[in-house]
A protein has these predicted regions:
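Charge-rich, low-complexity intrinsically disordered regions
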Residues: 2-133
Length: 133
């Protein structure tokens, strides 16, 4: 796959993605699987991952990093983990901000129903699209 550290011309990017239908003005266009995967990975790479947390909940990744098979938790998450559906926890998760941005959680937190806001975010908040900062 192409080196994505460069900003390609749109013509070159269309070739890399095997983008079909765009130039004809179609509403529905097609890209090859590798091209779509590349776009997804570039998107995912923009978000900081809590590497310690990711390694703790994915012992296979931790083992692979320790053996040198994978360089980092972020590399794994971007290249495979996200596409496999592995859980995401941001490196910059802020419990105070999470509670302020999601006031509906306050009562459940005070009642002890949500003892750990980070766990709540990972298990349901992320899928619900809740903001954390």
């Amino acid at each position: 796959m192409a080196d994505m550290d460069l900003l390609f011309s749109f013509e070159r990017l269309k070739e890399i993605l095997d983008l079909r239908g765009y130039d004809k003005g179609y509403e529905d266009v097609a890209v090859n699987r590798a091209g779509l995967t590349l776009l997804i990975q570039q998107y995912v790479a923009r978000f900081p991952l809590d590497e310690d947390w990711y390694r703790a909940v994915n012992p296979d990744v931790d083992d692979a990093i320790r053996s040198g098979a994978i360089a980092s938790a972020t590399e794994h998450f971007v290249s495979q983990g996200y596409l496999e559906g592995r859980a995401y926890c941001p490196a910059d998760f802020d419990e105070t901000a999470y509670l302020e941005l999601n006031p509906d959680l306050r009562a459940a937190r005070e009642d002890g129903m949500i003892p750990d806001l980070r766990v709540h975010f990972v298990r349901s908040g992320h899928a619900e699209g809740r903001r954390y900062k």
